[in-house]
Design a protein with these regions (language model features):
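Residue-level signature of mid-helix packing/kink "hotspots" within the transmembrane helices
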Residues: 50-58, 137-138, 142
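Helix-loop boundary and gating motifs at the non-cytosolic
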Residues: 2-50
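Helix-to-loop junctions at the C-terminal end of transmembrane segments
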Residues: 55-69, 147-149
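Intracellular juxtamembrane helix-capping segments at the cytosolic ends
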Residues: 28, 106-123
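Glycine/proline-centered helix-kink
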Residues: 25-26, 134-146
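Hydrophobic core of transmembrane alpha-helices in multi-pass small-molecule transporters
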Residues: 15, 84-114
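A membrane-interface helix-boundary motif in multi-pass transporters
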Residues: 146-159
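Structural signature of the two symmetry-related core transmembrane helices
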Residues: 72-86
Length: 159
């Protein structure tokens, strides 16, 4: 029973880890266009997210390596990313949006690698666990796309 519970937790972690990525990534450009951002501004926003994830990945990797509470750190990073994600709803001003988006990715981006490390350290079957991430991503793309089609792009962040 212990192994089954451990597997379920790892599978659920990856499913829900990749759901937000699947919900947001395919539609973010269209959403930003719908709130009035130019193509250049859309490119800046999305590239700042990536740059933030890369830069802060170094910091969070060091913190992760030096902490005993690895799961708590990951949970705190999830929470912070979620808060910043909600804050993106509060603005349509480019500079404010790009700042909040970069802050969100400072927490969200590095979580993927840290979770990979946690799963491998636990001795889980990484490819099996990772496949649940692909399932979560795919499910979120379908659900979010359907929701956006029915309710408009401006509604995608409420998911």
């Amino acid at each position: 029973m212990e192994k089954t519970t451990k597997d379920f937790k790892s599978h659920a972690l990856y499913f829900f880890l990749y759901c937000p990525l699947g919900a947001m990534t395919p539609l973010i450009g269209q959403y930003l266009n719908s709130i009035g951002f130019s193509g250049t501004q859309v490119g800046v926003v999305t590239s700042m997210g990536t740059a933030s994830a890369v830069l802060f990945g170094l910091l969070w990797g060091r913190v992760y390596s030096n902490t005993q509470s690895k799961r708590r750190l990951i949970a705190a990073m999830f929470l912070a990313a979620g808060i910043f994600s909600i804050l993106t709803l509060s603005t349509k001003v480019f500079f404010t949006y790009v700042t909040i988006y970069a802050a969100m990715y400072a927490f969200q981006g590095p979580v993927y690698g840290l979770c990979d490390s946690l799963v491998i350290a636990n001795g889980d079957n990484f490819s099996k666990v990772r496949s649940f991430g692909a399932i979560g991503f795919s499910a979120a793309v379908y659900i979010t796309g359907s929701y956006a089609e029915a309710h408009g792009l401006k509604s995608i962040f409420s998911i």
